């Protein structure tokens, strides 16, 4: 049995992190989402993976280069997930599982879905958090059978569909999927798009039973920036909690002066130098140095080729990508993609895209005077995230000047610059530079002013 991983969406809700990459290539604990999905599929006992790749498909091909178990099929732009799935039919000759490329799965849930699929079409159900039913296409089940679906319902519903299991007999329904959703209430306005849930609804209308498996995990869907921050925090907790003893790779050393309140996993040729403080479990890649009094205050994941030094502070739950520098007095909490440079008394909480360079003393606000959460605009819709709303989100390849300030919840697009001394209170689009224009006065001055 194979798994199909869908990676065809544009990821506009995840702005700015899906501009220069496929949404499924966004990293969680330094591994792309689609790589986590493929790993979970193989751990569940599936034999192969087919990835239906939309934007930036070449990045996904590069990620799985040399892995003969994974086939990446570019599908271009489609009219929705159902059409993305139909585009890879030639790769599938028997029953198969469909996973979303932007979702984190537990292998046990995928294995349970595969077992259910042996008895007919099946779906994996994840519980909808309280109050979030209007954000999802929801489902109801009874007695292990799917009863109905409804798009973004007004009244609470218990589940959403996180993954699918289709038999070959389902292909006529997959290939005939409409772009006009029927399963909505009066007043709802669905986009013209082929959703996988519409295929399942057609199966039900045809009298075909669809079995259900309720996921033990939350099957976290990474659709918006704050969900990416949450996904990384949860993955750090999961990976670090599995670390039960110190594990040092070849050539790695820990100085006797280091204070470790937990366990450490080091890759090859790593150094933890004098006076470092580690309060939690720490996972580190290869060729990384953590030296000169650096403080890591909780569980963390740090990539390869990093330099963490000179009394900097990394908060618990954080992720540093590969080839990052966190230097003199820098304070960081959140997620940094690869090749990020943090230095000289800067302070940041949120997400930093790859190759971001923060100027000295760049800081971000994290607390509003009303003690509330920042209201966001996601594709024009007002949203108030329950978590991480006040974090700062900086896109890939951005820079800041010295003393730049981010207000709570602001975002910058890719390839943008926040100039010296700027207080950024609103989102900055991609490919823009904002410079502070100040008014100054020049007057004469001399020793005469002092009575000479």
Where are these predicted regions, by residue range?
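Catalytic-core segments of class I nucleotidyltransferases/pyrophosphorylases
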Residues: 114, 145-240
């Amino acid at each position: 049995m194979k798994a199909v991983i869908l990676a065809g969406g544009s990821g506009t809700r995840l702005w700015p992190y899906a501009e220069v990459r496929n949404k499924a290539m966004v990293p969680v604990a330094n591994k792309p989402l689609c790589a986590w999905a493929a790993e979970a599929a193989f751990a569940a006992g599936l034999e192969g993976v087919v990835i239906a790749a939309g934007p930036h498909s070449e990045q996904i091909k590069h990620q799985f280069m040399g892995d003969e178990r994974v086939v990446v099929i570019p599908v271009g732009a489609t009219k929705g997930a159902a059409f993305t799935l139909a585009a890879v039919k030639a790769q599938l000759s028997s029953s198969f599982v469909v996973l979303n490329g932007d979702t984190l799965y537990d292998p046990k849930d995928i294995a349970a879905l595969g077992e259910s699929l042996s008895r007919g079409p099946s779906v994996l159900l994840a519980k909808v958090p309280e109050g979030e039913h209007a954000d999802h296409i929801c489902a109801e089940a009874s007695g292990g059978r799917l009863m109905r679906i409804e798009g973004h319902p007004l009244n609470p519903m218990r589940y959403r569909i996180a993954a699918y299991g289709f038999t070959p007999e389902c292909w006529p329904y997959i290939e005939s999927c409409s772009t006009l959703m029927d399963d909505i209430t009066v007043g709802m306005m669905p986009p013209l798009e082929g959703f996988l849930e519409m295929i399942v609804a057609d199966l039900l209308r045809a009298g075909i039973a669809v079995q259900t498996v309720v996921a033990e995990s939350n099957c976290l869907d990474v659709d918006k920036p704050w969900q990416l921050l949450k996904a990384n925090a949860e993955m750090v907790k999961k990976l670090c909690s599995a670390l039960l003893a110190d594990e040092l790779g070849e050539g790695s050393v820990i100085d006797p002066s280091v204070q470790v309140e937990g366990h450490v996993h080091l890759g090859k040729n790593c150094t933890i130098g004098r006076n470092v403080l580690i309060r939690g479990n720490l996972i580190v890649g290869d060729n990384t140095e953590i030296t000169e009094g650096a403080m890591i205050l909780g569980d963390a994941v740090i990539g390869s080729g990093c330099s963490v030094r000179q009394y900097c502070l990394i908060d618990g739950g954080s992720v540093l990508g590969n080839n990052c520098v966190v230097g003199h007095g820098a304070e960081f909490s959140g997620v940094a993609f690869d090749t990020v440079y943090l230095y000289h008394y800067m302070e940041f909480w949120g997400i930093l895209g790859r190759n971001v360079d923060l100027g000295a003393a760049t800081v971000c606000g994290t607390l509003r005077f009303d003690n509330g959460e920042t209201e966001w605009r996601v594709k024009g819709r007002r949203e108030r995230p329950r978590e991480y709303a006040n974090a700062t989100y900086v896109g890939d390849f951005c820079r800041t000047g010295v003393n730049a300030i981010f207000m709570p919840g602001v975002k910058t697009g890719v390839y943008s610059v926040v100039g010296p001394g700027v207080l950024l209170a609103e989102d900055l689009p991609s490919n823009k530079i904002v410079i502070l224009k100040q008014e100054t006065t020049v007057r004469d001055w001399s020793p005469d002013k002092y009575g000479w």
